[in-house]
Amino acid sequence: MHELLLFASVPAHQHHELLQQLAGLTAMQPRHRLERRLVFKAYRKPGLTNTRVGASQDLQGVELQRLNKMLNGGMFYTQVVGPVAKADFGGNPSSSGDPDVSMSGLEEKPSSSSSSYSYEDQPWKLEFRDIPEAGTRSAVTARLMASATLPKGDITAPMNAWGYSFVTEYVVEGDVFVLNDIVIFLHRVLLYPTGAQESHGPRRQLPAYQELSPLERTGSYVLQAAITVQDGGNQEMMRTASQHLFGLREQLKSAVRLEMADRLSLDTRAK
């Protein structure tokens, strides 16, 4: 599969206004998304990875084939992504665990209670993204992509067995809109508090949500517009997808400037 993308930087003061504009454009309320993102680095050469390890025995055949193709394709940084809710963070318990929030704001009153987060029940998926293609004539970022379901819980042992070592982790928070075949994600990266790192591996407990800090100190967000093309070799489908992104860029030009990203800034190769 191929992923075609455009990006824009959104100042913090423009965030709420853009949410409203996107809601009107897509005729839908934003779907709030909160994710743990674990970064792993390949340390084993391609072709040496055995995906039939431990808990991976529970994976279905199709998922296992997809996983094997990704992990044996080259030496890359890859991300393991797990959905969470604010209730999972210490100090913000919730009986529903529903990650959707209204557009009125993201702030919640802190609570002194502990979270109900269970690391052993945390679902995961592996997301592979290749370095964007070089020399593309179209003014969009295009790259190979794939994803596969992983076993729940502690994912470190299977990833190590597959030739990947844990590097770091962070949280992504944002809102998703869908316009026809375009997935629009207005988001920011949140970092864990300094000194809160557990032993070298993913956290088993999450800190209070209020303790997370934005990576971008100005508080700005990133607007990402993406289309997934199943057959990247079909030039007509790729052109059509690009035109759809250009159409969105035109619709939003009074608010933001959507453009392709610098190729090397999205380089996922493990050197």
Swiss-Prot record:
GO terms for biological process: regulation of transcription by RNA polymerase II; termination of RNA polymerase II transcription. Its main location: nucleus. It is found in: Nucleus. The keyword Transmembrane helix does not apply. One of its GO terms (molecular function) is transcription coregulator activity. Keywords: Activator, Nucleus, Transcription, Transcription regulation. GO terms for cellular component: core mediator complex; mediator complex. Residues 89-119 are annotated as: Disordered. It comes from the Eukaryota. The keyword GTP-binding does not apply. Component of the Mediator complex. Component of the Mediator complex, a coactivator involved in the regulated transcription of nearly all RNA polymerase II-dependent genes. Mediator functions as a bridge to convey information from gene-specific regulatory proteins to the basal RNA polymerase II transcription machinery. Mediator is recruited to promoters by direct interactions with regulatory proteins and serves as a scaffold for the assembly of a functional preinitiation complex with RNA polymerase II and the general transcription factors. Belongs to the Mediator complex subunit 18 family. This is Mediator of RNA polymerase II transcription subunit 18. It comes from Aspergillus niger (strain ATCC MYA-4892 / CBS 513.88 / FGSC A1513). The gene is srb5.
